[in-house]
Amino acid sequence: MARIVDLLATGQTFSFEFFPPKDKEEEQLLGRTIADLQPLNPSFVSVTYRGGRISRERTTRVVVDLLKTTDLTPMPHLTCVAHPRFELGEIIGGFRAAGLENLLALGGDPLPEEESYKELAYASELVELGRRLGFDSIGVAAHPAGHPRSPDLKSDREHLAFKMKLADFAITQFFFKVEEYERLRDQMAALGITKPILAGIMPITSLVSVQRMAQLSGYAVPDDIVRRIEAGGDDRAEIRKRGIEVATELCRDLLDAGVPGLHFYTLNFSKATREIYANLGLVGSGD
């Protein structure tokens, strides 16, 4: 299986994020989405992780199934939340034993009190643990607007620089302006970090949903983007069309700016990503 760090060394990557299904209906949806997106030949795919025993089982099942039954390169997410250190070691060891080569190490979002146990405080500690247990291709998260729990942007950038010195690449939270990415990249370069920072892409198919997700990550959708989407009125098809246009333009701008990779947050649906691929003229796109 390919290592993402090696793929990035050879050129731009295009990748997709999925979340593990909670029931049979979601499982069938994910299966259809993977079947729809596999012909686009993504560089890799990632599978999210919430934290705790159930999430551990679900994420592991999906990534191992992808590894065994498809030609895709899967990367599990892993968070510090809800696991003592020895359990995190068991999970990482299980990933390696299954043949996985890539890991996305995250601090993790707060969980309900009964699941909130957290022995490792920072993603950087998880990166170090992953290294010791055999992972040579590890990514971390980056927030263009700053992590919601960071006291200020300066400390956020310093913490990100520390993480990226330990890791191999970063994937950003979603954003909507190429300037936001360029600012982050330049700030990291000023701190001596030139490792790849992949851009997270979230197509707007519902403004309310995206604004809610953005708020959870401490980000606000830019006003001009909001106005552009809202100009679609109550016409859902028009709103969706405008959202795809916004995402396509952002991807073009990022590619022109030399972004090392685009990582699409699919929400387990394929259509928006396939449309953006087609708009960009990327191979394998279409229905």
Locate the predicted segments by residue.
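Active-site beta-loop-alpha junctions enriched in small/polar residues
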Residues: 18-21, 48-52, 77-83, 108-110, ...
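Active-site-adjacent beta->alpha loops and helix N-cap segments on the catalytic face
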Residues: 1-5, 25-28, 53-65, 84-91, ...
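Catalytic domains of carbohydrate-active enzymes, especially glycoside hydrolases
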Residues: 33-48
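N-terminal amphipathic alpha-helix/helix-capping segment at the start of soluble metabolic enzymes
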Residues: 1-16, 23, 28, 284-287
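Short, acidic/polar
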Residues: 24-37, 59, 85-93, 151-162, ...
